Amino acid sequence: MPSNKSVSDAPITQFVNCRILKNHKLQWEDLWVREGKILNPEKLFFDEQGFADHRVDCENKIIAPGFIDVQLNGGYGIDFSQASSDIRGGVALVAKKILEHGVTSFCPTLVTSPPHIYHKVIPELRVQDGGPEGAGVLGIHLEGPFISEEKRGAHPPKFLRTFQSGGVADLMETYGQLENVAMVTLAPELTNSAAAIHELSSRGITVSVGHSMADLSQAEEAVQNGATFITHLFNAMLPFHHRDPGIVGLLTSDRIPPGRTVYYGMIADGIHTHPAALRIAHRAHPAGLVLVTDAVTAMGLPPGRHTLGQQQIDIQGLHAYVAGTTTLSGSIATMDMCVRHFREASGCTVEAALEAASLHPAQLLGISHRKGTLEFGADADFIVLDDMLTVRETYIAGQQVWRK
């Protein structure tokens, strides 16, 4: 068939012999890519009389949307909460390394820090597209400092803050600016938190409840005010109680505004959350589960003492502790590891495990029209996996950026 490239002269790549994750199912279907986007082959055939310039044989493997990690504190010796002399270089190193774990986009996460750290680091962590140099940056996740002292976890207590008014003045005094910020985790029981949630939501920033002593009614009020996420469900919050289920109760609450989905992060590293708790959460609210790594500086490093934010942490096996304690301090898990563990622990389908690391975080951030999906017109950020869910190849904008 002769080619009519009236629409674009850009080369077309056709991925064949693959099962692609689409419409919540793995389907035997080819994937077509041009100019960094997923292409509709019917339009190509009938409107352009076009054909593929390149064919890639996937050898019966799975193609899924690239993973999105909305809670990543650092890794490979880099701590995003440290105001180093080369902040951008550190982010670039982590962005490059996580390609091998299938992550094509992420939110660099800053833990509770003093204002001068935020003022220096936030302007340096700019939103940017991914590519051969590394995964894309979707925006910063600010985890703290407006959190509960009782549920601070590994966050240093001396830098915790409360809201004076909850307005923009509080936020600017602490953070310096909100450009490039995608998400803020706060404790909704703090006085004036409602005003802060309104302010952040009105700016298009995702508000998450976490590191909190909130009861269910306080959590529901936060959602009614605009919060849409729960930071690492079960961790650093009141445990589930049958008379007041606390933040966990949001998974089955009947007071969620119509049309709104509450999403929740889960650290499926086999340490932070018992497999039974994973199963309970997933079966209660499968559409809201978002896998996160909450990975810290020591991801990819040997055991020993490392830095996280303003604190020292000890790595012992697969555990990361606040130095000298048994308090967990993030994880050293990678996203592909979390996907495999979640699949095994929950007994969910392959499709559900993959979507928890791709579609759901994209929906949470309001970008599922272009990320976390293989629908026509979406960004061609995807991964090739074998049946064991081991990542074999990673693509960003249709370009191979990593291969095993």
UniProtKB/Swiss-Prot annotation:
Catalysed reaction, written as an equation: N-acetyl-D-glucosamine 6-phosphate + H2O = D-glucosamine 6-phosphate + acetate
Catalytic residues, per the record, are 294
Which top-level group of life is the source organism from?
A: Eukaryota
Signal sequence range = none
Q: Which InterPro entries match?
A: Amidohydro-rel, GlcNAc_6-P_deAcase, Metal-dep_hydrolase_composite, Metal_Hydrolase
Which biological pathway?
Amino-sugar metabolism; N-acetylneuraminate degradation
Q: Which Gene3D superfamilies match?
A: Metal-dependent hydrolases, Urease, subunit C, domain 1
Catalytic activity, EC = 3.5.1.25
The answer on whether this UniProt entry bears the keyword Metal-binding reads yes
Q: Where does a divalent metal cation bind?
A: 143, 211, 232
Q: Which SUPFAM superfamilies match?
A: Composite domain of metallo-dependent hydrolases, Metallo-dependent hydrolases
- Cite the Pfam families for this sequence: Amidohydro_1
Cite a single GO BP annotation.
N-acetylneuraminate catabolic process
Q: Which UniProt keywords apply?
A: Carbohydrate metabolism, Hydrolase, Metal-binding
Residues holding substrate: 154-155, 235-236, 243, 269-272, 328-330
Q: Which molecular function GO terms apply here? A: metal ion binding; N-acetylglucosamine-6-phosphate deacetylase activity
Write down the required cofactor(s): a divalent metal cation
Q: Which PANTHER family does the UniProt record give?
A: N-ACETYLGLUCOSAMINE-6-PHOSPHATE DEACETYLASE
Tell me the protein family, please: Belongs to the metallo-dependent hydrolases superfamily. NagA family.
Relate the protein's function as given in its record: Hydrolyzes the N-glycolyl group from N-glycolylglucosamine 6-phosphate (GlcNGc-6-P) in the N-glycolylneuraminic acid (Neu5Gc) degradation pathway.
**Name listed for the protein in its UniProt record:** N-acetylglucosamine-6-phosphate deacetylase
Q: Which organism is it from?
A: Danio rerio (Zebrafish)
Organism placement in taxonomy:
Eukaryota, Metazoa, Chordata, Craniata, Vertebrata
